[in-house]
Amino acid sequence: MDDKLREEINRRRTFAIISHPDAGKTTLTEKFLLFGGAINTAGSVKGKANSKYAVSDWMDIEKERGISVTSSVLQFNYDGYCINILDTPGHQDFSEDTYRTLMAADSAVMVIDASKGVEAQTIKLFKVCVMRHIPIFTFINKMDRDARDTFELLDDIETVLGIKTCPVNWPIGSGKEFKGVYDRKTKIVSTFQAISTGGAKKAEETDYHIDDEALKELVGPYLFDQFNEEIELIDGATEEMDIEKVRAGELSPVFFGSALNTFGIEQFLNYFLKMTTPPIGRNSSEGIIDPVTEPFSAFVFKIQANMNKAHRDRIAFMRICSGKFEAGMEVYHAASKRKIKLSQPQQLMAQDRKIVDEAYAGDVIGVFDPDLFSIGDTLTTGGKKFEYEGIPTFAPEHFCRVVQLNSMKRKQFVKGVTQIAQEGAIQIFQEYTAGLSEIIVGVVGVLQFDVLKYRLEKEYGCEIRLEPIPYNYIRWVKDPTIDVTKLKRVSDVKKVKDMKGNPLLLFANEWVIDQVLQHNEGLELEEFRKN
């Protein structure tokens, strides 16, 4: 066994950050980069002409709207660890892309707004983490703003999400009265002070032991007494820390802080890195694949075309699951059943790219894609020909017919729509008999329609009109050999095919779905399909 290989893989930590929009996910991401030395100044405000854009928000439409539309991959070193952050879209309309990104993560950091508690998107993304049994760490952000009662916040997480919590630290006050956080293990209080620069630099923190008289004077007798009462309560009322339960995704360690003011970030990072694990074995068609003892293998979880105007190309993002990647190596592509060389391997810090000579299990690399890869594809070496578990495609919830305004640009239009669909931002469906002469687009959230229109115009020079169609539900026909043209009671149903030729049915409401199932014995419908 190569000791360097084991050492490199063991120092990897690969995680995603999930949250509801505006909970502070992008700000927290930037502060991690700040501590890792990957950036010198955090662009703390997005969307204003006089401010920097967030490092992780790089597409034009993201800059205009101040939202993370695509998923970026950010790597940096900190305290001997090599950290890979899978920065997921924070906007509620981009949960399917976020879902695929969570398939590549070993753990998740859940950011919660202290004034709001658990919100809709948090619930949806949390369920994905539970499905994968990955550890979930909670960072309750914006403690320096008006916040809900701390015990209420913990109860909210446990009741709504159904996961036990264990506070690692505890806040002293909140809002204008926020004085700092108490580390339950070391009994040290780190005091808070707002930073006039908006947290663009690392905050100066003063530490006091809980028994230090100076702390009581600083906090004030009323707040100090209230804090001591709360500490007695949590010692008896909350779960004890159990690292095995944490790693099984059954117990969430909770931290408090203010990402904007760079407060509580370093403490969180230090605990998080020690409590999480390096990459672990993944399930495949040949059982669990060990990350250290098995040769290089990876799977594609995202495809992005035309990442910026200087690079008219298509990049496949792949998560390395085992072994070591070396530039120029030949790999077996399971889907096409042939050997290929991975071209132009690179790691990305948003728009900035660097060519990589080597990478290890836990890392994410982007490789040039000659229209070969699809989401979920497995790559192997060493004579192995297994496949990792497929990534499900979830049923979209909004549908439009795409009308091309300039028939002379048909070729660019079809190429653009197809490429954007292969990236996973949209799903394309064709009329069952009409083929590509009529294209229906399905999306998880309506903002993706704007992204499609914007990208077709800016990147492919095609203007389109989107016409809503009166359907809200889509289901895959489980048995693709069924002739959907012979189904009964389908006058209000639209029959379509996906890009792989699988038959689907579009419905106006759930009642119609029930009627079709009742009148077609043996028909089974699915809400998602594995790639």
Please place each PLM-identified region on the residue numbering.
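Structural and coupling elements of P-loop NTPases
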Residues: 1-531
